From Swiss-Prot:
Record's protein name: DNA-directed RNA polymerase subunit beta'
CDD domains per the UniProt record, alphabetical: RNAP_beta'_C
Keywords: DNA-directed RNA polymerase, Metal-binding, Nucleotidyltransferase, Transcription, Transferase, Zinc
Species: Prochlorococcus marinus (strain MIT 9215)
Biased composition (Low complexity): 1354-1366
SUPFAM superfamilies in UniProt: beta and beta-prime subunits of DNA dependent RNA-polymerase
GO molecular function terms noted in the UniProt entry: DNA binding; DNA-directed RNA polymerase activity; zinc ion binding
Keyword Zinc among UniProt keywords: yes
Binding site for Zn(2+): C248, C315, C322, C325
Superkingdom of the source species: Bacteria
Keyword Transcription: yes
Record's subunit section: In cyanobacteria the RNAP catalytic core is composed of 2 alpha, 1 beta, 1 beta', 1 gamma and 1 omega subunit. When a sigma factor is associated with the core the holoenzyme is formed, which can initiate transcription.
Amino acid sequence: MTSSKPKKTSRVRKTTKNSKKNNPVTMPVLPKTPPSFKNKVVDKKALKNLVSWAYKTHGTAITSAMADNLKDLGFKYATQAAVSISVDDLKVPEAKQDLIGQAEEQISATEECYRLGEITEVERHTKVIDTWTETNERLVDAVKNNFNQNDPLNSVWMMANSGARGNMSQVRQLVGMRGLMANPQGEIIDLPIRTNFREGLTVTEYVISSYGARKGLVDTALRTADSGYLTRRLVDVAQDVIVREEDCGTELSIVVEAEDGKFGARLLGRLTAEDIFDAEENIVVSQNTAIDPSLSEEIEKASINKVKIRSPLTCEANRSVCRRCYGWALAHNHLVDLGEAVGIIAAQSIGEPGTQLTMRTFHTGGVSTAESGVVRSRISGKVEFSSKAKVRGYRTPHGVEAKQAEVDFTLKIVPQSNNSGKAQKIEVSSGSLLFVDDGEEINSDITVAQITAGAVKKSVEKATKDVICDLAGQVRYDKVIQPKEVTDRQGNITLKAQRLGRLWVLAGDVYNLPPNARPVISSGKNVDEGTVLAEASQSSEFGGQVRLRESIGDSREVQIVTTSMSLTNFKLIEESTHSGQIYNLESSDGTSYRLNISPGSKINSGEVIADLTDERFRTKTGGLIKYAPGLSVKKARSSKNGFEVSQGGTLLWIPQETHEINKDISLLMIEDMKWIEAGTEVVKDIFSQTSGIVTVTQKNDILREITVRNGNFYECDDEEVLNRFTEEGNLVNPGEKILDGVDNTEILFVQKLETSKCRGLLLRTVEEFTIPDQAELPQLSHVKQEKGPHLGLKAIQRLTYKDGELIKSVEGVELLRTHLSIESFDATPQMTIDVESIKDDKDESINRLNLVILESILVRRDTVSDASHGSTHTELQVNNNQLVKAGDVIATTQILCKEKGLVQLPNVVDDEPIRRLIVEREQDKIKVKISDKAVVKVGDRVVDGDPITKTVKSTSCGEIEEISNSSVTLRLGRPYMVSPDSVLHVKDGDLVLRGDGLALLVFERQKTGDIVQGLPRIEELLEARRPRDSATLCKKSGIVQIKKGNDEESVSLSVIEKDDLVNEYQLLIGKNIMVSDGQQVTGGESLTDGPINPHELLDCYFNDLKDQKPLIDAARESISKLQRSMVSEVQNVYKSQGVAIDDKHIEVIVRQMTSKVRIEDAGDTTLLPGELIELRQVEDTNQAMAITGGAPAEFTPVLLGITKASLNTDSFISAASFQETTRVLTEAAIEGKSDWLRGLKENVIIGRLIPAGTGFSGFVEELSSEAGPHPDILAEESGGYRRAQNLRPDYTVDMPQSPAVSSTAILDDPSDEDLETTRNRHGIDPSSSNFAAFARPNAENQFSEDQLPDPAALEGLQEEGLLSDE
C-alpha cells in the first residue's frame, strides 16, 4: 500500500543542482527539525502524518517510542475525560422531518407524472430511488451541522469525526435515516427505511433492513474468496520479478501528464528519464533524479505539464527490474535495494485492497449509496452560459427533459440588480446535464446541473421491467410509438416500440369467452343488462343414446352410450368370499369363467376380462414340460400372461416332485438314489407325495433340494447303450429299443443315472395333454356399428411355461389358460369401456354382463357474473334415453351482459376465434360541461390538466368521444409511457384485463458503485478477458465516412486509409457511433460504444504502426500504448472506490502480461511458429540474423492474462505448482526443459535459499561462477550455450567469409585465472583434457594429436559466437 504523504514542512534543500548532476541518485535530505507546534485538534490524518514524518526522518526505534508516548497521552486524557456513549448521545437533527417531507412531496409528484403517462415505470422507479438517495445525502449534512453547531463535544460525533471508530455512513443510520436497501438480487427496493436505529424501525422496515444486512454478510464471504484468489494469481505471475541490477541503461521512458496542472503523488519516488527544463530553459530537475514532494511542487510551479520518468514498463533488465527504473521502495522512501522482491510487493498491493473493498458493503450494512455531482443554486439570479457552450436536448433517467453539454464550459448565475452578491460559477464538463436554460431567472436552492465525473466509468447493465395493466379495457397506441416487428434468430416475431410514446388502455368491461363460444351480437350495438352477448354449444362426437346423470359439483354430466354389448348367453353370478365379492360367468353348457373385473369399473381395449376355470390342464406336481412337434406359440411372451398358442398340438409332461429344503444334512431320513413309496418322510416333517427314485442335492453339509422321480430303474453297464442317453434325459417313441428285455408301448423319458454304487437308466412315464387350435367358446359376440367405435370378444389360449422348462414344485400347476379379452375398434385411445351389471329383459332374476363405451359431456351450471366473466345460462337440448346423431347439440351456454353499454369486438386476425369482447359502460365515460369552443377534436387523447376549451381543463385522462355545444364526452383511460426498444406484448386494439402485461421496458441501469462490480472488473482486466458486445475499433488510421442506409436504422461506416484504401466496418444493431463524418481517427480508436477488447486493441495498434516503423519498434510502441491504457483502466476501478495504489505496482504486473510475442514466421532462426517468447529474446535472435544475413523471425505482440502468463513462465516448477500440474509437467518432460530456478517459488519448492533479500548476493555469485570464463553468457536466454545442442540437426548457417564480420566475432581471450577457476569447477585436468576450450593453445602446445578438438562442441561454440572461425 502507498504510504500517506509526509506532512508539508519547511524543507531544507542541502543538495545543489550541480552536485545532483555529478551524483545522479542523490536523495534529498529530510529535515531533522520536527514540525512546528500547531494549536489545533489532531485527528487521525494529522497523527498519520506525524508518525510517517518521524519514521522517514528518524527510523523505526524513535518512531515506536514516540507512538508509545502518544498512546499514553491519549489514554491519560481519555481516562480523565471519561467519554462514554449513551443512547442520549444519539441526537436526531430537527431538519429530518422537513427533508423527508420534501422527499415525499417529490415522490408523489413523480407518481402523478407516472399516472399521467409522462414517464415510464422505469423512470418512476429511478426517480424514487434517486430522490431518496439525495435526501439521504442532505440528511448526512444536516447531521454533521447539527452536531457541529449544537454539540461539538458529543461523544458519538467525536468518535466518528476523529477517525477513532465508525464513519458518517454509520452515524447517519443511528441518527439520520437508514436509507434504501438492496434485495438479495442486488436490486434496490424503492421503499426506504425512513427511521433510524435511535427511533426504532417498523416491522416492514425491520424485514427490509435485515434483507440488506444479510446481503452484506453474504457478499463479504464471497468477495473475500474472490479477492484471495486474485492475490494468489497476481503473486504467481510476478513472483520472479526481483531487483537484480543497478541500472539497465535504457533510454525508453513513460510520460506522466499533469491533471489540472497538478501531478499529485504520481511523480513521487520516480526517477526522471531526462533533464527537465522550465520555460526559460533552466534545468529544474536533472536526469536520473528521484522526485520527492518538494521537487514535485517545483515542477508544478514551473508549469511543466509533461514529465518523462523511468518505469518498470520500459526497464530493459533481463527478467527483472533495475533499481533506477523502479524508483523508491515506498516502505521507506529511498531507492529500492538490490534483491527486493518487488513483484510480490506489487501483487499484494493490488490484491489486498480487494479484501478491503469487500468490507465496504459490510460496514454500511448493505445500505446502497450512489455518487452524483448535483449542483444547486446558492443565490437567485439569471443563468448565463459562456460563449462556447453547446447543448442538445436529452431525456434523463427520471424522464425529465433536460440539456446535455457537448463541450466543457462555464455557467454563471448572476444575481439580480437589487440583490448584491457574488455571481455563482459552475464548471460544466461535457456530458453533464443542465436543468436550466440560458437567460432563465431562477431562485436559490434549485437544482441547476448534474456534473458527470470523468474518471468514474460506471458500469451499466441491460435490465427489463414489466408494465402491468391497472384496469380492464382496450389498448390503443400513440402514433409516435411506430411499432416494428422484429424477428430473432429463432424466428420468433416480437413487436418493438421505436420511439418514446404512450400506450393507452381505454376503460371498459372486458368479457372472457369460453373456448368454443361465438359472439352473437355485432360491434357497435347498444346492449342492456341480461342481453346475450355470446353463445357456446356442446355437441356429441359419435352420437348414441342419451343418459342424464345426477348433477355433481358445479356441473352436470351427460352420458351418451355410443356402443353397448350385452353377454346374453352368460349368467352373471356373484359369490361372497372373505376377500370380497367374486363374479363368475356361467354359460348354458356349464363352462364357467372367473371374472377379473367387477361391474362399475372401467377397462381399456385389449384387457383380459375373464379366465376359463378348466381343471383338464392342471397337474398334480411339478415337472418338466416339452412341446411335441406341431405345437407352436407366438414368440413374444408377456411376462404375466405366458405364451399365446398360435397352433394346437400335444404338450408332453414328465412329472417330478421337488422339495426345496435348505436345512442341515443331519435331518435327512432317506438314502440317495433309493426307491421310496408315496408318504415316506424324507426329511423331518416333510413327506413325499409320490413314489419314485429319490435324489439328494447338498452343498457344505446343507441340504438344498430333494427330488422324487417316478419310473423304473434298470442297471446297465453297456457303454454303448449308456452313451445314447444323457443325464438331462431323452424322449423315446413307442417301439424304439432301449434295453434288452424292456418293451416300450408308450412314449418314455429316459435318463442316464450314475451313482457310486451302480450305473443304469431311469425310464419315466410321460403324460400327454392335447391342445385344440381354437379355444372352445360358446358363441363369441361382436357388435358392429355404422360409425364410431365398436366392441368384440376374443378367446386366447396361453401356455404358462416355455419348452423344456423345469417347474420345481410340490403342488400342481396350470399348464394352459384360456382368457376372454375385449377388443374395441375405431375407438380413440382415451375412450374407456365401462362394465355394468344389468337385469335380463325376460327374467328379472338373472343378471347379465353389459359392456358399453360412453361419451361423457360435462355441462356447465349457470354462473353469476364476476370481474372477468359475464353471468352464464346453460340449457340442455336433449332428454333422457333420446337417440342423438353425431354432431348433434347437447347443451348451449349463453354469456349474458352484466351492465348496459356499447359492445365492441376486437379486430379479427386470420380467422382466429374471438376470445374477448368489451362493453363500454356509462361509468367508463365522463361528461365535461363547456361554455366556449372546444380546442380538442374527437379521437384526441388528453390527460389531467390538458385544456379542453380555453377556459376548461380536463380532470381525468382519456379519449375524446364526442363534442356537443354544451359538453365534451371523455372515455376514461390510463396512459403508460413506453421507451424506445421496449417489447410490446399487446397489439393496437387488443382487449386486456387488469394484471395483464402490456410491455417489457428495456433500459440500461447503473450497477451500484460497489466493489461487487469492482473486483470482477479488475479480474476482467488482469485476466485480459474478451468482453461481450465489445466496441468496434479502428484498424488503421484514416478519415471516417458515414453513410445513411435506405431506412433510418441502417448506417454504414468506413475509414478511408492512406493510399485511398477504404475499410468498411460491420456495425451491430443497437451500437452508438462515437465518431462523426470526416473525423480523423487513429488505429485503436473506438468507433462505436462498448467495452474495449484489449487483444483487439493491441492488434489494431500493432497493425497500424508496423506499416510506418520497423517491426521491433512497432511492437514496442504498440505494447507501450496498451500498457498505459491497462494501467489507467485498473487505476480507474480502484480510484472509483477511493483506494490509492501506486502506479508502479500495476506497471510491474502489466509488464509481466505484455512481455511475450508470438512467432508468426521463424525465418532462418531456430524458433518455432506459434511459440511464445520474450520480445528481448527475439530481438537478440534477429540481430544475430542481421549479422549472418539470415531471414529474421516475424512476430506479433500478445497480451496474456495473469493465469495464462503464470502458466507460460520459463520455470516449469512455478507453472506446475500453480495450475494444471499434470499438463505442465508432461509438456516440460517431452520438451526436455530445464528450470534455472530464477524465481522465488521454484527455490521454495526445491528447498533452497530464495534469490531475494539476504539470499540475493549468493545467487549473483552462483550465476557468475556458472558462467565461467564467459560472463556475457548471463545476458543470454535461459538455455545459455546449451541451446547449441538443441539446434535442428539438418540446420546450418553459412557464415559469410568477409574479414570484417569475423573480426567483430573474436572475443577477448579469457584470463589464466578464469580458465583456472572454470577447470577447477568442472574438475578438469588440463593435461588430460581433449576439450580444446579449456586449454590455452601456445607455441609448444599446438593442437597435438591427443588434444583432438570435439568438432560438434567447436561448431556449437562458433555458432554461439564464443569462438571465432580462426
